[in-house]
């Protein structure tokens, strides 16, 4: 049995964020949103999202931003589809399951699901997603 660390430190959360978004950049359904549509600067995005998840999960201050407003602006250009929300959550959960385990890992997975469901309802141009998370293969 191999030991997987929990997502209990900013360093581990940063590693999760980088690992996840490398996968996003290679995903046929998500890459067009992040790479083509949003033109994400990955190093800035990794830093911002590391601060976001450290704030959400560990209570560490430092995140400043308005994610719903930014995502809503993107969705006005090309509306987000429900399968994109499902893929984002499935890939996020799969990334966590492949490298981390423990109460913080499970908590972040639950919070990611809630955030994605909320975004799908709060962004006017997005398709509302039913919250069903597809099975992904752990790699």
For the regions a language model picked out, list residue spans one by one:
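Core of compact, soluble alpha-helical bundle domains
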Residues: 1-139
């Amino acid at each position: 049995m191999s030991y997987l660390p929990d997502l209990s430190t900013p360093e581990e959360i940063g590693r999760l964020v980088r690992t996840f978004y490398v996968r996003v950049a290679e995903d046929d359904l998500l890459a067009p949103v992040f790479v083509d549509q949003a033109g994400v600067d990955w190093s800035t995005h990794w830093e911002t999202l590391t601060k976001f998840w450290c704030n959400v999960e560990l209570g560490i201050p430092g995140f400043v931003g308005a994610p719903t407003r930014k995502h809503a602006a993107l969705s006005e250009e090309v509306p987000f589809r429900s399968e994109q929300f499902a893929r984002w959550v499935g890939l996020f959960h799969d990334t966590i399951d492949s490298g981390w385990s423990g109460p913080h890992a499970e908590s972040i997975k639950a919070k990611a699901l809630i955030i994605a469901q909320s975004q799908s309802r709060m962004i006017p141009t997005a398709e509302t997603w039913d919250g069903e998370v597809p099975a992904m293969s752990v790699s």
